[in-house]
Amino acid sequence: MTIQILSPQLANQIAAGEVVERPASVIKELVENSLDAGATRVDIEIDKGGSKLIKIQDNGSGIPKSELNLALSRHATSKLSTLDDLDAILSFGFRGEALASISSVSRLTLTSRTAEQTEAWQAYAEGSDMAVKVIPAAHPVGTTIEAVDLFFNTPARRRFLKSDKTEFTHIDEWLKRIALVKPEIHFTLKHNGKQVRNYRPANNQDQYLMRLAQICGKNFAEQAIEIDCQHEGLTLSGYIQSPFFTSPASDTQFFYVNGRLIRDRLVNHAVRQAFSEHGTGELASYVLMLEIAPHQVDVNVHPAKHEVRFHQSRYVHDYILQALQSALMQVARASISLPEEKLVEFVEDDWHSKPLSTGRVSEADPSNYATQSKFDEKPRESGSQGQSSSISAPSSYSRGGEYSARSQPELPSASEIASYTQLLKTPQTAQASKLVNSDLKTPMPPVLAGQYWVYAGDELSLLPIDIVAKWLVKRDILAKIDNGLVSQPLLMPVSIKVDEDWLNTIDEREQLLRQLGIEITIRLGQLIIKKVPPYLRQSQLVTVIPELLQWVRFEEPTHEALALWLAKQDDGKFESAVATWSAFSQLDDEIQQELAQKAKVLPWQSWLEEQLSD
């Protein structure tokens, strides 16, 4: 076949494959256009999950008659005109592909009127027909777009659509996300003629908290801590869960950059690292908005604009991490240091806080960042919360409501120290260890307290055995997961109250669950767990299984990620230090060194010398 230029119709349909994945994608593009046009109200109406009808009406600035035809052309946009504009994007749209792509896979009608026009005009385009018909119409100032029969001319794409309920769920989820970052906009959503969502404009904090409760749940809104931190062109605001929140949920995790919801590993790592000090980690709940100079972030990474790249990624990571750590620690410390009746107002180190009843944490002291230049790539070396520095362990509440300090690893007793010192001074002990393990490929180091291998070199160090054991479990899972893990029936099936979102997730991920060795059914409003792989038998299934379903609901995790997750859930202790060392010593030297670096190595030489000198 000879090389040739694609026809505009075919090019648009190919582009639609990137931009228009499902009805929710169409609504995302059209609503973002409404917001860029300055709309203060956006009404969304869909039929049959959006596959039959998608209708978006706004009160924005509208489109002049002379530009209606051009608006449906590919690479036509009002958002930018020069290369410099691409480096300073603050609008949602800028690629000029959405309307052309949508019109190529649906029957699209665009009706609009500007404030300067006395009448409205309507443009109609259908599928591969590039001709646009423009006729007079009746319409208030603003724009209405109707997309009917989505994918009517691409049957293969239409077959890949899920059930109406599933497609509606994706639309509803996206609307929640945009409603959180655009509180001043009035959003409504109708499905099959019935209004299902009505997010009224929130013009003050109390009204925003009502919207937050409507979307994220009343429990989160009541205990959330408000963040408002500014420094050197960066502003982090929003709400995070209290360190004492007992019901964190991974489905309440929203992060926005310049008003755009994004998925970014760097951001996720910073947030999870901050919350990991309080035991929540990946389950932490938050709604955070980062404002940054547009030339410091590249949003032109993905056609759907879900991803961004920061020009100074390390600086942004450390800024987010330190802001969240300071806020969480401030609340935890205040709960300890002040009597209950004085918890109404307090001032703590770097942060100035408003009354705890509002859960607000306000602007950070700029002196915390004084030693670091703007957008410096190097990790912070000063300040109390830098990535490379250590912080005090935050506090938490026990289930009984009383304060208890975060548990710390127990230090060896005096007798253990004496035994350990004697071990180091007596060569016969090491020789005995070699005799016991003479059948191993490499002699096993001495074992301390049944938990650590003792390495002697320039500096004594302890390698936790359970970390190596977990890695070996992960490797074992990876070797078996392709053919499916073995299921083990539970003696007594576990039942959980079902969430309606799980129905579609279980249906869509049935093969994945079977591959993991998990057998679950839904009966009488209960999720019944019948079989699980051996790695989950000792886990809290009422927590673990919902966590897994929430994870796979929007993602397709790799086998590597699934194996790591299962290994972390395996609460079984390693069989023995000798058996673990035997498996460890069979690995390649390269892998052994990599494991030793990843494991937590504890320097004990100086600590022991101090203890013995006392």
Swiss-Prot record:
Q: Which CDD domains does this chain map to?
A: HATPase_MutL-MLH-PMS-like (cd16926), MutL_Trans_MutL (cd03482)
GO CC terms in record: mismatch repair complex
Q: Which cysteines are joined by disulfide bonds?
A: none
- Gene3D superfamilies this protein is in? 3.30.230.10, Histidine kinase-like ATPase, C-terminal domain, MutL, C-terminal domain, dimerisation subdomain, MutL, C-terminal domain, regulatory subdomain
The question of whether Protein biosynthesis is a record keyword is answered with no
Query: Sorted alphabetically, which keywords does the UniProt record give?
Result: DNA damage, DNA repair
A Gene Ontology BP annotation from the UniProt entry: mismatch repair
Q: What does the UniProt function comment say about this protein?
A: This protein is involved in the repair of mismatches in DNA. It is required for dam-dependent methyl-directed DNA mismatch repair. May act as a 'molecular matchmaker', a protein that promotes the formation of a stable complex between two or more DNA-binding proteins in an ATP-dependent manner without itself being part of a final effector complex.
Name of the molecule in the record? DNA mismatch repair protein MutL
Per the UniProt record, the source organism is Shewanella woodyi (strain ATCC 51908 / MS32)
Gene transcribed to yield this protein: mutL
